[in-house]
Amino acid sequence: MTLRLGDIAPDFEQDSTEGRIRFHDWAGDNWVVLFSHPKDFTPVCTTELGAVAKLKPEFDRRNAKVIGLSVDPVEDHRRWVGDIAETQGAALYDMIHPNASDTLTVRSVFIIDPKKKVRLTLTYPAATGRNFEELLRAIDSLQLTDSHSVATPANWKQGEDVIIVPSLPDEQAREKFPQGWTALKPYLRVTKQPND
């Protein structure tokens, strides 16, 4: 089954390092970054989980939970925790084994919103570690664009200018953005990032 943007993320029940979970219940009303990794006790995966653990306060600040999955048994995950803590300087959290598949050979990532909709998908080759700072940036963009009539340009970062969506007529844009905007083209109106 291929998951597409806008699909409801499938629910599942599975044993994890923190006990048995049902995915939708575990996610609650949070944003979720769900990612697969090829195998426990491998170098790239170890650095990725260390990076996730170090960034946990940033994910928490965005009301986002992170969950990793692989085909390895939960017992292996528990043994691997020590290596990650030792080599990455942070503890593993929310590492589970949700599927019994034996073919996970790539690094897939799904960002799922509080309504359980898939909002972003990325697939990396096994030899390329993920950029979790980019996933934080994507969450920032999704949360901002969900609550305002804006889009974020290439390489946008929190606090930088945004683009007013083309579907918003100028009259409504004047109400939503009283500080105004710069029109580079009729379809490209740049304004300050709205603050909630």
Please place each PLM-identified region on the residue numbering:
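Chalcogenol-based redox active-site neighborhoods
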Residues: 1-196
